[in-house]
């Protein structure tokens, strides 16, 4: 059975259609996926030039086509997503689902794989890479991950992939990668006012072998291996970066694992009234940025801060003590309730953002379940501070990284 799911669009004036292809995460795969996505975003065999491809999309009343790879745990999802005005909003008899879908597949099924376009994309990406990692916080995260996954280097890059593979790729490499990608597990997702018509128009294009393969992944999450490390790296910037990474196990009950880190991240650093913000400012008298993020698919709870290089030990102590406090069962109920309200608001507002709806369809397809935003709101309402404490107790400090 072909992997396709088009939901009924009942609230937006624009429709969305996307093809998603799943391949294993490795630095080389991510580099080639990034390069291919950049090339396809620029031009295609039927629209051989940036201007020609842009004009083709403009004629569809400024349709937007986004092509990019994204890392989900141990997988890369190559995403081809088009957002376009619903035909019933336009008084143009020549503008319809069929025309939009034809152009969508004209572009994504027919890449222009030549040396000139590839060199342009490589230069673009090299410039983006250097600019992105010139920012200390981005560089610190990159090096933190490489250290975290030092025993599993295939997982050590979440963006760009290997710069060496990206720079050294040949046209033949990209052609082979594109051919292999067509065999990868794939799914077509979307939202349209007339989902049946959209499905009928899409079906003839979904002939690649991957659309018949199971898209769901049973072991998407990368297990955190307990192997503590501390690393200090010098840097020329005035501010330093500190990253404290905690691992946690995969055997937690699903809801506890899914929402424990989410609640803890908001509790510690969700806004300026959260624990870390107030404690850092009270003790150090400075408005340093503090961030706590739960990387659910990586079994990684990460707390990071941009700091005065002379105060990183004080900031580290505050971070570590704040986590230990929760592990000891000490929770500020007022801050916890604020976190609950903030998370509930996020899920209540999510259905009004079309892009988030498609992301939910994708994550549900990857995990093989149907979780709605209503389910998430209910889970947040029922989640207790005792459960957050239970989650915190499973954390083990696995890496301290300092960019100073």
Predicted regions and their residues:
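Cytochrome P450
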Residues: 22-29, 47, 69-73
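Charge-rich, well-structured scaffold segments of protease-associated domains
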Residues: 55-215, 283-404
């Amino acid at each position: 059975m072909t992997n396709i799911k088009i939901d009924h669009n009942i609230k937006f004036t624009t429709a969305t259609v996307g093809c998603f292809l799943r391949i294993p995460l490795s630095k080389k795969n991510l580099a080639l996926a990034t390069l291919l996505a950049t090339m396809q975003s620029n031009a295609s065999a039927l629209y051989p030039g940036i201007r020609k491809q842009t004009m083709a999309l403009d004629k569809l009343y400024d349709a937007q086509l986004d092509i990019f790879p994204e890392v989900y745990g141990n997988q890369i999802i190559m995403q081809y997503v088009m957002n376009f005005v619903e035909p019933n909003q336009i008084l143009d008899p020549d503008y319809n689902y069929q025309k939009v879908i034809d152009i969508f597949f004209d572009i994504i099924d027919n890449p222009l794989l030549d040396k000139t376009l590839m060199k342009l994309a490589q230069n673009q990406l090299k410039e983006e890479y250097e600019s992105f990692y010139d920012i200390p916080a981005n560089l610190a995260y990159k090096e933190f991950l490489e250290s975290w996954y030092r025993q599993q280097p295939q997982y050590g890059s979440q963006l760009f992939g290997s710069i060496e593979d990206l720079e050294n790729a040949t046209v033949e490499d990209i052609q082979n990668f594109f051919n292999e990608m067509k065999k990868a597990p794939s799914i077509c997702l979307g939202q349209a006012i007339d989902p049946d018509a959209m499905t009928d128009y899409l079906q003839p294009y979904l002939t690649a072998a991957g659309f018949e393969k199971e898209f769901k992944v049973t072991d998407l999450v990368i297990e955190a291996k307990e192997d503590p490390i501390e690393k200090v790296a010098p840097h020329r910037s005035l501010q330093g970066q500190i990253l404290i990474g905690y691992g946690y196990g995969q055997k937690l009950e699903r809801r506890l694992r899914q929402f424990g880190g989410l609640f803890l991240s908001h509790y510690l650093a969700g806004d300026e009234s959260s624990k870390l913000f107030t404690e850092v400012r009270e003790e150090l008298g400075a408005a340093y940025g503090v961030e706590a993020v739960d990387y659910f698919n990586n079994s990684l709870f990460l707390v990071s801060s941009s700091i005065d290089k002379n105060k990183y030990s004080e900031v580290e102590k505050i971070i570590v003590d704040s986590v230990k406090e929760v592990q000891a069962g000490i929770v500020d109920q007022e801050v916890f309730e604020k976190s609950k309200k903030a998370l509930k608001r996020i899920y209540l507002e999510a259905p009004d953002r079309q892009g988030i709806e498609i992301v939910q369809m994708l994550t549900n397809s990857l995990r093989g379940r149907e979780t709605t935003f209503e389910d998430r709101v209910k889970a947040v309402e029922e989640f207790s501070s005792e459960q957050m404490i239970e989650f915190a107790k499973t954390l083990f400090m696995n890496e301290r990284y300092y960019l100073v």
